């Protein structure tokens, strides 16, 4: 997949990037997303919630260049044409998880089938990363399905050059006849401001509400 180099000297975000990159400023934001219709539609059509959420996340990410901006293995700043999800799958027997990646696809059915094939092949492997090689253009996604939460924060101080979002989903819960799920975003301020965090949340909620257009 193509990695497009950003020439820092000509980038309109240069001042912001250098300031927050040097400070290593990251932040997290958690929002409860209304999945009432989404959950009902997924159940009616026989689709699992987790891969359907992953698909919706990747639709937002791949629509917006800011969420695909990072530093590649050659230490170059730029953005990927497309990201693929790298998601966690829990093993009840070992009480550990694996990370599996699946090729992104704009077509939900194609993505879902690819997800199911990858899950069948790799979910019982006792490795942290069973599907290799892992491409550089992957986005970390995980789910903590045992609890809902109002705040969630990750700290990755051992890798100062990781600029891509990290997304964590919690357990869904009911309130006032609605079903909600917490979604936590971990962002690097060098590339994503509060506006971009809001952009992700609003577009994600929108695609979830319009589930009957794609599922």
UniProtKB/Swiss-Prot annotation:
Catalytic activity: chloramphenicol + acetyl-CoA = chloramphenicol 3-acetate + CoA
Alphabetical UniProt keywords: Acyltransferase, Antibiotic resistance, Plasmid, Transferase
Record EC number: 2.3.1.28
BP GO annotations: response to antibiotic
Active site (UniProt): 189
InterPro entries membership: CAT-like_dom_sf, Chloramphenicol_AcTrfase_AS, Cmp_AcTrfase
One protein family per Pfam: CAT
One MF term in the entry's GO annotations: chloramphenicol O-acetyltransferase activity
Subunit record text: Homotrimer.
NCBIfam families: chloram_CatA
Protein's job: This enzyme is an effector of chloramphenicol resistance in bacteria.
Family to which this protein belongs: Belongs to the chloramphenicol acetyltransferase family.
Protein name: Chloramphenicol acetyltransferase
Species name: Staphylococcus aureus
Underlying gene: cat
């Amino acid at each position: 997949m193509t990695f497009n180099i950003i020439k820092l000297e000509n980038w309109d975000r240069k001042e912001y990037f250098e300031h927050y990159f040097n400070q290593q400023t990251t932040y997290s934001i958690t929002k409860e997303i209304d999945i009432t219709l989404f959950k009902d539609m997924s159940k009616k059509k026989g689709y699992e919630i987790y891969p359907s959420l992953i698909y919706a996340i990747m639709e937002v990410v791949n629509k917006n260049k800011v969420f695909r901006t990072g530093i590649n293995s050659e230490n170059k700043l730029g953005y990927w044409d497309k990201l693929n999800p790298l998601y966690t799958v829990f093993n009840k027997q070992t009480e550990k998880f694996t990370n599996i990646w699946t090729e992104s696809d704009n077509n939900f059915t194609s993505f879902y089938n690819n997800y199911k094939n990858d899950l069948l092949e790799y979910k019982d492997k006792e490795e942290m990363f069973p599907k290799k090689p892992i491409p550089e253009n992957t986005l970390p996604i995980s789910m903590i399905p045992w609890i809902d939460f109002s705040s969630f924060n990750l700290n990755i101080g051992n890798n100062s050059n990781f600029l891509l979002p990290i997304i964590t989903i919690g357990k869904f819960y009911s309130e006032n006849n609605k079903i909600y799920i917490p979604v936590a975003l971990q962002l690097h301020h060098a590339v994503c401001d509060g506006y971009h965090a809001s952009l992700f949340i609003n577009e994600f909620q929108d695609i979830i509400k319009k589930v009957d257009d794609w599922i």
